[in-house]
């Protein structure tokens, strides 16, 4: 979620077994691969994640978000399911999510959409 903390960066992980069956040298590349600036940014982010013990913090606070979203799903017929992991959550909605997202913003809540029927809730990893 916050791999670069604002610096554009992407990554993926796979087991060696999957890599051996999926990739050969040269199969995966990028224009900016090996960029030292991005590498330094990611390294600094990881250092801060360790210093602040972000993973433990997310494990502590995520159940609260999950519980509150589950309560909303139970309360409103237009919300049909919650899905996600940790602090990356989505709620399926039977209403046009663009309109719901716009009204949420009018009420002071930033909610983004994912596809045509999901409201995404992605708070900062340092949320209390």
Q: Predicted regions span which residues?
A:
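Conserved N-terminal phosphate-binding loop of PLP-dependent enzymes in the Aspartate aminotransferase
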Residues: 1-128
């Amino acid at each position: 979620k916050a791999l670069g903390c604002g610096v554009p960066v992407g990554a993926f992980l796979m087991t060696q077994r999957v890599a051996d069956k999926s990739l050969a040298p040269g199969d995966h590349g990028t224009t900016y691969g090996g960029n030292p600036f991005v590498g330094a940014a990611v390294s600094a982010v990881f250092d801060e994640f360790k210093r602040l013990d972000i993973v433990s913090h997310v494990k502590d606070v995520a159940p609260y978000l999950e519980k509150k979203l589950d309560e909303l799903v139970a309360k409103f017929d237009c919300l049909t399911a919650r899905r996600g992991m940790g602090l990356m959550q989505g709620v399926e909605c039977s209403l046009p999510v663009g309109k719901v997202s716009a009204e949420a913003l009018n009420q002071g809540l930033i909610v983004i959409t994912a596809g045509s029927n999901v409201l995404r809730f992605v708070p900062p990893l340092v949320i209390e």
